[in-house]
């Protein structure tokens, strides 16, 4: 199958040009002008549009069981929503397994979840929920099997202590894997939460007050120092929500430490005032939404290159689940927001169309750097001969208002309801096949492929 995309502006992280793009058998074969492919071929007119590499979202939680609830998006509805929003690859953070389980236990479970449902290509981050010799010995074997990143938690049920973190950092570094971490100070959060609950303060706003930015920033600083102690182990901070943590990361980067960081659209565009609305439970996630001052600091990091990746942390619990389980108590509410369908459009509208970032920087944040950090480059995150034919076409002339009834996830609400975006996703191709066009999804469950990722190689800092 041949596809010729004509008359668009093709954008990669290192530049853009008005040129045509030829995809054959799912692979980019040629870029340039006056391309004359062999018949037959499909021609797509991208006049006036940007032609970007398909998005790579390296932080989703599909089909996750958090003990009190299971998220309402599985690998079909989640990847369907992703591709309708211009994302053609996801790397899912697997949930915790049973107490004492092997490291690969969850990989086997999650490959079963995704195998016959994923619409687009996918991989997983390993999850380290306890440390012993057997777990450490499994790490290099899993890297050989194509899992080159693993997640640690400093909070929740399976949080690691500093000694366990050091052991994990060392073995992951030795094995060619990247350590990712959810950084929040669990003891400080538990103390604040208990204080509020004892006083009967259980409204949504106390979720944010129980997890102040200092809890996140302290844990970021601690992880940076532990990574240095562990032999300058590479480190990736997930879902950054505040400027103080970013300051610590800037300092580490200035000292040439291999650290990288992602943020999410919710921390750039939503703020803590959402907790005081009638539907405040809709916005329970961790870290919580911050104030507008913190948003501004994150936008500075987006603009000046201090932030490397924009992902989503898509973790969908319906409003019905939230209300039934929480019964008005923030501490009982399952955490997470939907957003995998909105990431590309929101960042394009609020970033590119406002002049905060260039189209090239948009590519770097949404596909190129995620692919480089997580062992998918140059197969993903790039439009060049030999790369996969993963493409998203965005028309900057179109304006759209986000309405949940038009979205493709399995939630019953959107935190972005009513947001007006300048720029519309008009077509998404996965390996050369159009599976979203002008509002219509045409993909099929099970067409996505598991991606064996290469061992971690640090991009130049």
Curated annotation (Swiss-Prot):
Q: How is it modified after translation?
A: Carboxylation allows a single lysine to coordinate two divalent metal cations.
> Which GO molecular function annotations are given, in alphabetical order?
hydrolase activity, acting on carbon-nitrogen (but not peptide) bonds, in cyclic amides; metal ion binding
Question: Where, by residue number, does substrate bind?
Answer: 156, 286, 335
Q: Which cofactor does it need?
A: a divalent metal cation
Swiss-Prot/TrEMBL keywords:
Hydrolase, Metal-binding
Residues annotated with N6-carboxylysine modification? 151
Substrates-to-products reaction catalysed: D-5-phenylhydantoin + H2O = N-carbamoyl-D-phenylglycine + H(+)
Residues annotated as binding a divalent metal cation 2 are 151, 182, 239
Cofactor binding mode and count: Binds 2 divalent metal cations per subunit.
Instruction: Give any single GO term for biological process.
Output: pyrimidine nucleobase catabolic process
What does this gene product do?
Catalyzes the stereospecific hydrolysis of the cyclic amide bond of D-hydantoin derivatives with an aromatic side chains at the 5'-position. Has no activity on dihydropyrimidines. The physiological function is unknown.
Q: What is stated as this protein's family in its record?
A: Belongs to the metallo-dependent hydrolases superfamily. Hydantoinase/dihydropyrimidinase family.
Name of the featured protein: D-phenylhydantoinase
Specify the species: Escherichia coli (strain SE11)
Question: What does the record give as the organism's lineage?
Answer: Bacteria, Pseudomonadati, Pseudomonadota, Gammaproteobacteria, Enterobacterales
């Amino acid at each position: 199958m041949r596809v010729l995309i004509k008359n668009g502006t093709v954008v990669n992280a290192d530049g853009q040009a008005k040129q045509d793009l030829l995809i054959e058998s799912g692979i980019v074969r040629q870029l340039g002008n006056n391309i004359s492919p062999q018949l037959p071929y499909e021609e797509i007119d991208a006049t006036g549009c940007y032609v970007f590499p398909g998005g790579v979202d390296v932080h989703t939680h599909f089909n996750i069981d958090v003990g009190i609830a299971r998220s309402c998006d599985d690998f079909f509805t989640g990847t369907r929503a992703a591709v309708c929003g211009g994302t053609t690859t996801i790397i899912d953070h697997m949930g915790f397994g049973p107490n004492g389980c092997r490291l690969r236990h969850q990989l086997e479970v999650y490959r079963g979840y995704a195998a016959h449902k994923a619409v687009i290509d996918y991989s997983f981050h390993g999850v380290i929920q306890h440390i012993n010799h057997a777990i450490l010995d499994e790490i290099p074997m899993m890297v050989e099997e194509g899992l080159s990143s693993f997640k640690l938690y400093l909070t929740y049920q399976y949080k690691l202590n500093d000694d366990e973190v050091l052991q994990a950092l060392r073995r992951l570094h030795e094995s060619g894997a990247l350590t990712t971490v959810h950084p929040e100070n669990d003891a400080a959060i538990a103390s604040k939460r208990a204080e509020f609950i004892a006083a009967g303060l259980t409204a949504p706003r106390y979720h944010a007050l129980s997890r102040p930015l200092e809890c996140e920033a302290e844990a970021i600083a601690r992880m940076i120092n532990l990574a240095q102690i562990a032999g300058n182990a590479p480190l990736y901070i997930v879902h950054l929500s505040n400027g103080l943590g970013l300051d610590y990361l800037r300092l580490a980067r200035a000292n040439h430490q291999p650290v990288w960081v992602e943020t999410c659209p919710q921390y750039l565009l939503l703020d803590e005032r959402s907790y005081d609305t009638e539907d405040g439970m809709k916005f329970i996630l961790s870290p919580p939404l911050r104030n507008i001052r913190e948003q501004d600091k994150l936008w500075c990091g987006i603009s000046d290159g201090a932030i490397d990746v924009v992902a989503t942390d898509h973790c969908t619990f319906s409003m019905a689940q939230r209300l039934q389980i929480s019964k008005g108590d923030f501490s009982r509410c399952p955490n997470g927001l939907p957003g995998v369908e909105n990431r590309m459009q929101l960042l394009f509208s609020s970033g590119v169309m406002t002049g905060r970032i260039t189209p090239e920087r948009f590519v770097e944040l949404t596909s190129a750097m995620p692919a480089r950090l997580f062992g998918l480059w140059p197969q993903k995150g790039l439009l060049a001969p030999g790369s996969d034919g993963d493409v998203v076409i965005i028309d900057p002339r179109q304006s759209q208002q986000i309405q949940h009834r038009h979205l493709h996830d399995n939630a019953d609400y959107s935190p972005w309801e009513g947001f007006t975006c300048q720029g519309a996703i008009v077509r998404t191709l996965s390996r050369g096949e159009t599976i979203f066009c002008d509002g219509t999804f045409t993909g099929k469950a099970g067409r996505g492929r598991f991606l064996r990722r290469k061992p971690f190689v640090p991009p130049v800092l």
